[in-house]
UniProtKB/Swiss-Prot annotation:
First-tier enzyme category under EC: lyase
GO cellular component terms, semicolon-separated: cytosol
EC number: 4.3.3.7
Alphabetical UniProt keywords: Amino-acid biosynthesis, Cytoplasm, Diaminopimelate biosynthesis, Lyase, Lysine biosynthesis, Schiff base
Cell location: Cytoplasm
Quaternary organization: Homotetramer; dimer of dimers.
Binding site for pyruvate: T53, V209
Catalytic-site annotation from UniProt: Y141 (proton donor/acceptor), K169 (schiff-base intermediate with substrate)
Organism field: Streptomyces coelicolor (strain ATCC BAA-471 / A3(2) / M145)
Function: Catalyzes the condensation of (S)-aspartate-beta-semialdehyde [(S)-ASA] and pyruvate to 4-hydroxy-tetrahydrodipicolinate (HTPA).
The protein's name: 4-hydroxy-tetrahydrodipicolinate synthase 1
InterPro entries: Aldolase_TIM, DapA, DapA-like, Schiff_base-form_aldolases_AS, Schiff_base-form_aldolases_CS
Site (Part of a proton relay during catalysis): T52, Y115
Length: 305
């Protein structure tokens, strides 16, 4: 379910959902359905499946399609489903895009091809070929720290002319470049780094794709709601309150997948282990995550008292 709002085609509050596994490491579709239902019930109007946080490098094509089908069954039309289909191979990416469309996705998240580091003209051709292949709208995923290749602002501007390229997940840490694209296109920008949600929203972003939302789905939705209501002071306060948890989950030297699953597991929510080469968080790390979570929960309780 994409929205009717061109400024936020996949909703405002998106979670980069983890992919739950069983204790033996198999895909846990029942757990995925329960987690997805919880996320939507608590404020997410969009879910990104099989992204980085969803361990897309270590799930099979069949698992990716099954995940979309199961989550669609769980959430119905209450949330948009964006399927991560990006790979280092254009042909494979197209195959995944077609499979995601058939499984019931509303949109595609397409990352810049990694490792091969194509030049900008080849990068542009890659995205156009994927966008041409299916009828689904596309969210470009700009995260050069992981892929080794930046989707340069001028390339994004050219790609914005494609009728199915409608959005960008922004993890480039380039505020000037983001504003350049926003000023020259109608693309919907989504903050892909939790610490940048309010700053990017304040300059015209559509919303966010958050890893931290796996644990606290209502947190950043409240930031956007406060800002939209004109209470910018409260929006800033809520964003700052999130800093300890965001730092623990996203800036402590471990991938967000690892920290999100550790905290979800500690809270008794569907998650399971991560797949190799990732390794699950140790007890000390998990204790630190729980402490940051508890601090945020205590702050929220005091503000409501």
């Amino acid at each position: 379910m994409t929205t009717d709002d061109d400024s936020a085609p996949f909703g405002r509050s998106l979670c980069a959902m983890v992919t739950p596994f069983t204790g033996s490491g198999a895909l846990d579709l029942d757990g995925a359905q329960r987690l997805a239902d919880r996320l939507v019930a608590r404020g997410c109007d969009g879910l990104v499946l099989s992204g980085t946080t969803g361990e897309s490098p270590t799930t099979t094509d069949a698992e990716k399609a099954a995940l979309v089908t199961a989550v669609r069954e769980a959430v119905g039309d209450r949330a948009a489903l964006v399927a991560g289909v990006g790979t280092a191979d254009t042909r494979h990416t197209v195959e995944l895009a077609l499979a995601a469309e058939k499984a019931g996705a509303d949109g595609l998240l397409v990352v810049a091809p990694y490792y091969s580091r194509p030049p900008q003209d080849a990068l542009e051709a890659h995205f156009r070929e994927v966008a041409d292949a299916s009828g689904l709208p596309v969210m470009l995923y700009d995260i050069p720290g992981r892929t080794g290749t930046r989707i340069e602002p001028d390339t994004v501007v050219r790609l914005a002319a494609h009728p199915r390229i409608v959005a960008v997940k922004d993890c480039a840490y380039d505020l000037l470049g983001t504003q350049k694209v926003l000023s020259r296109t109608g693309l919907a920008y989504y903050a892909g780094c939790d610490e940048q949600i309010l700053p990017l929203y304040a300059i015209g972003a559509a919303g966010y794709v958050s890893t931290v939302a796996n644990v606290v789905p209502e947190l950043f939705r409240a930031v956007l709601d406060a800002f939209d209501a004109g209470d910018t002071g409260r929006a800033a306060l809520l964003q700052r309150r999130a800093v300890p948890l965001v730092e623990s989950m996203m800036a402590a030297g471990l991938p967000g997948t690892v920290t999100a699953k550790a905290l979800l597991g500690a809270l008794g929510l569907p998650a399971g282990p991560v797949r190799a080469p990732l390794r699950s968080a140790d007890r000390e790390t998990t204790a630190g995550l729980l402490a940051a979570y508890g601090e945020l929960a205590a702050d929220a309780g005091q503000s409501q008292a």
